[in-house]
Amino acid sequence: MKRHLVFGAMLTLTLAGCGSVDPALVQRPDGVAAFEGDPVELAEAGEALWNDASLGTAGVSCASCHVGGAQFKDSFRQPYPHQVAMAKSMSDLESINGEQMVQFCMIVPMKGEPLAWDSRKLAALAAYVDVEQRNFAAK
């Protein structure tokens, strides 16, 4: 538990120095359709990606911050779209959906590039975020 608190504090300090994120980077461009696939298969693929630290350059995965629901705020109990403090403070976005949250995390904590909007990876991670959200809300 102490390790998670230390990691959370380090992440907060890291994010505080990141400045801002252009909202256009985390908003689906007009005319670009999402990848369509079986939701169960996408969520299963998303779970593997959730644990993949190679998606970014920071050496962390989604699970690095959120193992066992760590670092989720109470607002995560609400279905998307909803306000996320990190996205609000760094991009002035009042509300974001799960797909946008994936893109935001790709850019900020994971220090990677946003995923292609029509990619299976983005659809899979967004599907798995839905699973994580439902599990967290049920606690």
Predicted regions and their residues:
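Short Cys/His-rich Zn2+-coordinating modules
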Residues: 43-50
